[in-house]
């Protein structure tokens, strides 16, 4: 019995770490994963050193850009497909249909390719050719359609639904109102944050588009902490959610726009609905603050972030300042800047958006594109 116990202990120790030929300790805690879908999640939680020192707090950011598809949306993509499989709506050789303008489509393309499903994407025809080409490269069938409001039957989401209904063995995954999206973050992202912080966090903040990330993580952290952990919405210009929360639940007509993509909303989605009333507040983050933080994170932290990630970091900084020194605030780095570099680091684009002067002089060296 003793020898068996020792053997089990030694085996566990071997799994947890190994010596490399170069005397570097190499972790083997996770071992290999079985295919792309098992590589989704378990992303690092990074302490942003400069901002943490500046605020006297711990500002922690979850590196979702390290998912296989490059964004937090990989989690939702996997869960909406798994949900369709579990409910018998999707069988081998079937077709997944979604209306998406961005990262959810890329996540679905990776998941569907790995599982052997066909993927059809409807998106507004305002999207870049590069994004369309990437989805097609990943095996998706892409239909760019005129950009119209959600209440118009020709909206890209409604076209996606009708396309799925016209096929056998097909499912419209409906990322905005399919609560499997929220469940992905209740079952994965939330528990990961809780474990990575040892439960020692004071607040969480992030922006929202479908509502799944904010709602799912908020639900889990409030349940795990007995309501102690606060949660704040970070909202870009052009979204109605900040005013909805500040007014106590009054929806106004959406107006304005933002440089951010995939976040902001004109309605309360089914993913957000269960948890919007439990939020502790909201912050409206200007494009000027967002673009400056993109450049700051690159310069100070070596992090190459997309606009929604930078907006989240601004919000985390403001929440930390609100809570005071010694607080721990967690946010989400939704994706990197790789898909947006031709704009975010372009002098002409920044000038066209009136954002050139938002970049501090010492950071202008990163404006490397004409």
From Swiss-Prot:
Names of required cofactors: pyridoxal 5'-phosphate
Transit peptide: 1-16
Pathway assigned in UniProt: Amino-acid biosynthesis; L-cysteine biosynthesis; L-cysteine from L-serine: step 2/2
Subcellular location field: Mitochondrion
A single GO molecular function term of this UniProt record: cysteine synthase activity
Gene3D superfamilies from the UniProt entry: 3.40.50.1100
Gene Ontology cellular-component annotations: cytoplasm; mitochondrion
Reactions performed catalytically: O-succinyl-L-serine + hydrogen sulfide = L-cysteine + succinate; O-acetyl-L-serine + hydrogen sulfide = L-cysteine + acetate
GO-annotated biological processes: amino acid biosynthetic process; cysteine biosynthetic process from serine
InterPro entries listed in its UniProt record: Cys_Synth/Cystath_Beta-Synth, P-phosphate_BS, TrpB-like_PALP, TrpB-like_PALP_sf
PANTHER family, sorted: CYSTATHIONINE BETA-SYNTHASE
Protein name: Cysteine synthase 1
Organism, as annotated: Emericella nidulans (strain FGSC A4 / ATCC 38163 / CBS 112.46 / NRRL 194 / M139) (Aspergillus nidulans)
Phylogenetic lineage: Eukaryota, Fungi, Dikarya, Ascomycota, Pezizomycotina
Gene designation per UniProt: cysB
